[in-house]
Design a protein with these regions (language model features):
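Nucleotide-activated chemistry modules centered on ATP-dependent adenylation/adenylyltransferase
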Residues: 1-255
């Protein structure tokens, strides 16, 4: 009989799979989560998510009797960042930030290990997400679809069972704090709430041959923008912000 494995992201849909599996009476052998570390001592998750995962793991162990397996890549983000390119015209050059095309994101690499050959994976696709149903197969099942649980129902289940991630109730980011796909608001909050992480991101920015954003903007560009906001020369909620504003000697938008 194949192993039945829940791939847990700690999001509401993924978490609610536990309730749907229980309701359906489906087998569940293992629960696996892909962990990424920024450095040897700094996790990729913001502190609120680190604490939530610990609490959720304890609840899951107590109620379902299964220990969540945290699988991580053998290398940290920082180690992969400074790893030299092995072949091609850029051989020997530091990799730097991941590209959107040819992304070396560690979470993507770890995720490949979450579905061992011959196993059945449970994934959190809600019943009201038909555009994602093409990801389902005999080996990849959604308990939520089978139980007819919508995204709203998943959230209510998580709230009722004290398993709702802080990403739904606070400004906590659900993902790596250093991800170059995050938006300006998340970067602004990172700089404000975790200056030590922001300082590390600035260091990496100095050492990367690849810009942080695909459009050519760097972490230092965002630092300059946020500094002007701190000084009252730019408004954080400016809907018509343009990067060329940073090049002006005086920002006339304050008048």
């Amino acid at each position: 009989m194949p192993e039945h494995i829940l791939s847990l992201s700690y999001g509401k849909d993924s978490m609610a799979c536990l309730g749907a599996i229980e309701r359906l009476g489906w087998p569940l052998d293992r629960i696996i989560h892909a962990d990424v570390w920024a450095t040897d001592t700094i996790p990729a998750d913001p502190p609120p998510m680190v604490e939530f995962k610990k609490r959720a793991d304890a609840i899951i162990k107590r109620r379902w009797g299964i220990t969540v397996e945290h699988i991580r890549h053998r290398m940290t983000y920082e180690e992969m960042f400074y790893r030299p390119i092995c072949r091609g015209p850029k051989k020997g050059v530091t990799k730097g930030f991941p590209l959107q095309k040819g992304n070396w994101c560690l979470k993507l690499k770890v995720s490949e290990k979450l579905s061992p050959k011959g196993s059945v994976s449970y994934i959190g696709i809600a019943s009201d997400e038909p555009d994602r149903f093409h990801n389902l197969s005999v080996a990849r099942k959604s308990p939520l679809v089978a139980a007819k649980w919508s995204e709203a129902m998943c959230r209510r289940w998580c709230e009722k069972n004290n398993l709702l991630s802080p990403v739904y109730t606070t400004a906590t980011r659900s993902g790596c704090w250093f991800c170059n796909n995050q938006g300006v608001e998340q970067l602004r909050l990172l700089r404000k709430n975790y200056p030590e992480y922001w300082a590390l991101l600035l260091k990496w920015d100095n050492d990367s041959p690849v810009t942080f954003k695909a459009d050519g903007h760097t972490v230092h560009d965002f630092e300059c923008r946020f500094q002007l906001e701190d000084e009252g020369l730019l408004a954080a909620d400016d809907k018509v912000f343009r990067w060329e504003m940073l090049d002006a000697e005086l920002n006339y938008r304050i008048f």
